[in-house]
């Protein structure tokens, strides 16, 4: 729905993002979790944070155990449409926690156990988890109710995070996605209304 009769079609506005999303089964997903909060920050700060990975060590300190969240390991794409994409390697712990193997396996464990992988098999082999999980997801996708045939290996494990100008972000995987939206507070510019949705 758009109040501007002269606006360009949504597909044209989203441009590359629309092309990237074509293989994801979004229309088959349902919203399973959602929350709306009022925050003590301006909505533009929220969007700026989701557009980079500098904030992850402070806002998401546990992420380093399950993803290589350092900005040097991530790919950032800015499009002429003012939208952007962040690619972050998942199921590959950050270099900073290689010595914390037990903690890494504790946090990655439930995710890989779902795909019939044993965390203890990866003692001394943390960097093998990502590739093995990609193979295992391909092997078991139909059995688990998925079809990953249209996706690249990295799409099965890594964080593909998009920011749509001006105030929407989402992370997507073939088996689920989360939507994040920061909106201006109706009366206080130092506050924000923040919506979070998870679809699977």
List PLM regions with ranges.
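C-terminal catalytic domain of Rieske-type non-heme iron oxygenases
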Residues: 1-200
